[in-house]
């Protein structure tokens, strides 16, 4: 394996036992925070062992907290005082972040140094792998990190005209609330988009449709910024003129969404197309604002390069890219492998991935053609051993599922292995299984450590694989979202 290195900030072996009761030598009411949970709450224990989840508290702090919810064996509380502060506590970079009334809920970890955020996420990944999948990676991959601010190239901004306040709000929701935060800036958005928040509020306030525009979706490419306006009623000519004036003043492209996602269309045809580049592979990916693309393009470029380095596909390899989307991994794989198959659940995305493949093939320099690629639409949540075998032998797999994970895929692989070793209750295999071999290596990119752990448990304990490496990808700094990557090799 190339590239795995030990991360220096792992707190302890995830298979070890955590303390089951809190300290008894602190003053009454004080709590020692020992870790953070998946919602970025500090975790402490009372002397009787009862777990307390504390908003705003950090590991290794001594705190007091006000309980607002009680259950038999746990409580939820909010931080009221810090008696010993963590050296990793920092001043938040956004005035709208915090525990105060009306605070924005878009970020949860701005009070924690970004390096420590990564360590917490690594611990969350390892804990999930061990406790849910009974899997411990042989090696910890170096975390993938990038800019902590101005990284969020995709966002869904809620919009509401609040008559009582006499203003329009545009932004994320408040913490634990359906109300929209009164945001003037947002430092995780690109600077030019953050600077547009107040002008967007003024724009919507000036429109006839101010009460029927509930959302603006942001999609930034390398050179184009697109805004998708959801409107519940037809827009007047005056409103269309206001949108055009805003676009000219701020250098953005307006798209309109009168109904469902299929109705999204440009306000005015023509103009440049949204795209992002993967320069390590000479690939350019055109996309529409409603297509799924990664929120953080800086991290995505590193992620694709790292994933392909770990996959290590060569000119003799046939590779399957499961949940291929627009071809974010498929097209780079086609620069290295003999053949690649991209399989995706959405017919529309399959059509878009074919278009992207053709465009990039046409634009390749002479002598650097992409390997043959096939794109297939299939429900990947209903996979069977027969379907897996019908896809043919692949030397390596790249798996990049949504939050639901790739359970059906892992289960089909496990069923085949169990049948071949003669396990009791294993399903019978079709005659076509003879000669079919599972992939030698699987690189699994995950946006949910719980479903990764579940699938890893199947691969390791039932499908004949070992987890040779795993690590986090800090795709969403300052949030509790844990993106990760794991590598499995056949035993």
From Swiss-Prot:
Listed Basic and acidic residues bias regions: 1-10
Positions annotated as active site in the UniProt record: 447
Entry similarity comment: Belongs to the class I-like SAM-binding methyltransferase superfamily. RNA M5U methyltransferase family. RlmD subfamily.
Keywords in alphabetical order: 4Fe-4S, Iron, Iron-sulfur, Metal-binding, Methyltransferase, rRNA processing, S-adenosyl-L-methionine, Transferase
Every TRAM domain range: 18-81
Region annotation (Disordered) ranges: 1-28
Binding site for [4Fe-4S] cluster: 94, 104, 107, 186
Top enzyme class: transferase
Name of protein: 23S rRNA (uracil(1939)-C(5))-methyltransferase RlmD
Function: Catalyzes the formation of 5-methyl-uridine at position 1939 (m5U1939) in 23S rRNA.
List of residues binding S-adenosyl-L-methionine: 294, 323, 328, 344, 379, 400
Provenance organism: Paracidovorax citrulli (strain AAC00-1)
Catalytic activity from the UniProt record: uridine(1939) in 23S rRNA + S-adenosyl-L-methionine = 5-methyluridine(1939) in 23S rRNA + S-adenosyl-L-homocysteine + H(+)
